[in-house]
């Protein structure tokens, strides 16, 4: 055994669990050459799993008395469809947007639910599989800012697509320079208002996209940290003979937070889906 081998401190434990499995080592805060391989792999696997679950529900659906699984899926589909009708008034657009919203909800829920797994379970299995005791692995894709901003950026692109599709390229361009402050018959004032309106539109799009992704990331990142702290309580209990009640506190705290976190992961998936519908609905409206 190496002489410098030692059990990790609490800060080392947390820092290690916050490191991603990456294609290359990240050298700066913003580095687009870096790919978080764990986030990509887990999100793709969960996406396929979500598609399989919905396919299975459609495959096994019956017109008679539905099973509990079928009833749950039907309730989910009906909920999403009602929200889509409330926000997207174009029936043709809803044919794509409603299934998209359902996909977003199921996918994000599954990614959020990875936070309910024991903190060390998959990372330790990965270390055993690779033979590297210091291998990194994060299994909650939505606790990765690149994932959530990627999702919100995709929503932004769809907003652009539907703005052009519904209003035409000229109509959307006209809206960018005339809303929210309008225009003027005076060419000078019209130019000034056009620049101000365009800047306001850019700020609005950027703010909505960043807040859309940051809201999901912030909640899931905080939840991940809390689970790490609870796991540290268990580690402290194992190393302490005097802290008799610490293991009990670890179990109680972990159970309470897990139950509460089920609400959080569901609520965050719902909020992200609702904002997606709202933003796409706004893209259909004239300003």
Swiss-Prot record:
Transmembrane spans: 37-57, 96-116, 149-169, 187-207, 224-244, 266-286
Claim: Transmembrane is one of the keywords in the record: yes
Lineage: Bacteria, Pseudomonadati, Pseudomonadota, Betaproteobacteria, Burkholderiales
GO cellular component terms given for this protein: plasma membrane; proton-transporting ATP synthase complex
Source organism superkingdom: Bacteria
Gene: atpB
Name of the protein: ATP synthase subunit a
Matches recorded under Gene3D superfamilies: ATP synthase, F0 complex, subunit A
Keywords of this entry: ATP synthesis, Cell inner membrane, Cell membrane, CF(0), Hydrogen ion transport, Ion transport, Membrane, Transmembrane, Transmembrane helix, Transport
